[in-house]
A protein has these predicted regions:
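Conserved N-terminal phosphate-binding loop of PLP-dependent enzymes in the Aspartate aminotransferase
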Residues: 1-281
Length: 281
C-alpha cells in the first residue's frame, strides 16, 4: 500500500485498474494531521508516501511544515518518503527539496534532466537503491529498451551544465516577476482569478475562491478555462489546456511582453464572458 496526495484533477486516469487503485490510499495535500493519521493507521502495510513539493496540476506549493511533518511521520513509521520532482526539479539545482531542506528516501525526475528529450529517472538513499544492484542476490530487475540511452544522457548533461545555480536563480526571478505582472492584469480586469506558482512555473485559476488546496483549484470554471485557451491561441500563444505556464531560459523581454499582452486581451474576453453567460465550447 502507498499513500498518494490528492491532486488538482479528480478521479483515476483511464487504464488504472481497481486492483491498482486498491493498493493506494489517497492523502490530503497540505493537511498534515489527516495524512499523518493515514500513515500511522496503515502501519506495516504501508510501503511509501509519494508527494509533489508543488502540485504540477495546479501549481500549488506544499507548505514547509507539511513536508517536514511527512518526513517525520514516515521516519517514525519506517515508511519511505518519495518526492515527485518530475516537474519541480527545474526550480532549484537541488529541486524544491533543496529549497525546503527536506531529504526524501527516493526522488523521481524527468523533463528538465533530459535536455529536451523524453526521460525519466529515480534515485535515493544508497541502502534503498542497493535493491537494484544487479550484483546482489535477489536484486530487483530494472531494464528497458531506452534505459541509459546515450542521446538523452548527452543532451541532459549539457542542459544541466548550462542550467547552473545562476541560471536557475535568474529564471526563477523572471518567473516570479511574470507571475506578478499576470496577477496585476487579473486585478485590473476585476476578474475572479489568480495565478499561483513558484519561480518559472505558474498556473491561472479562474475561480473566486482562494486557491490554497486542490479542492479549491477544482472549483475553477472549466468552460472559462477552455475559452482562455482558445483566446490565447487566437492571439498566437499556444498554452496548455489547463493554463499551466512554464518560462524557458530562452525567453526574452520581448517574448514575455508579447505573452502579457496576449494574456491581457484573452483574459478580457474571459472576463466579459463571465459577466454574461458561460460559453459552451
Amino acid at each position: 500500500v502507498a499513500v498518494a496526495m490528492s491532486a488538482a484533477a479528480p478521479g483515476l486516469p483511464p487504464g488504472i485498474t481497481p486492483g491498482v487503485a486498491g493498493d493506494v490510499v489517497v492523502g490530503h495535500f497540505n493537511d498534515l494531521d489527516r495524512t499523518s493519521s493515514l500513515v500511522r493507521g496503515h502501519g506495516d502495510r504501508l510501503a511509501a508516501v509519494i508527494v509533489e513539493p508543488m502540485l504540477g496540476s495546479g501549481a500549488l506549493m506544499a507548505e514547509r511544515a507539511f513536508l517536514e511533518g511527512l518526513r517525520a511521520v514516515t521516519t517514525e513509521c519506517g515508511v519511505l518518503l518519495i518526492l515527485d520532482e518530475v516537474i519541480t526539479f527545474r526550480l532549484g539545482v537541488g529541486g524544491l527539496q533543496g529549497a525546503f531542506g527536506i531529504t526524501p528516501d527516493l526522488t523521481s525526475f524527468g523533463k528538465i534532466i533530459g535536455g529536451g528529450l523524453p526521460v525519466g529517472a529515480f534515485g535515493g538513499r544508497a541502502e534503498v537503491m542497493a535493491a537494484f544492484d544487479p550484483t546482489r542476490p535477489g536484486a530487483i530487475a530494472h531494464s528497458g529498451t531506452y534505459n541509459g540511452n546515450a542521446t538523452t544522457m548527452a543532451a541532459g548533461l549539457v542542459a544541466l551544465a548550462y542550467f547552473d545555480d545562476a541560471a536557475v536563480t535568474a529564471l526563477n526571478a523572471t518567473g516570479d516577476a511574470l507571475r506578478a505582472r499576470l496577477n496585476a492584469v487579473v486585478a485590473s480586469l476585476d476578474v475572479e482569478a489568480v495565478v499561483t506558482g513558484c519561480g518559472s512555473l505558474m498556473q491561472l485559476h479562474l475561480t473566486a475562491r482562494p486557491v490554497e488546496t486542490p479542492e479549491a483549484a477544482l472549483a475553477a470554471n472549466g468552460q472559462l478555462v477552455k475559452l482562455m485557451h482558445l483566446a490565447l491561441a487566437n492571439r498566437g500563444v499556444f498554452s496548455s489546456t489547463r493554463q499551466l505556464y512554464v518560462v524557458p531560459t530562452v525567453a526574452t523581454r520581448a517574448d514575455l511582453d508579447l505573452f502579457v499582452d496576449a494574456f491581457t486581451d484573452a483574459l478580457g474576453v474571459v472576463a466579459q464572458a463571465s459577466r454574461t453567460t458561460t460559453p459552451v465550447l
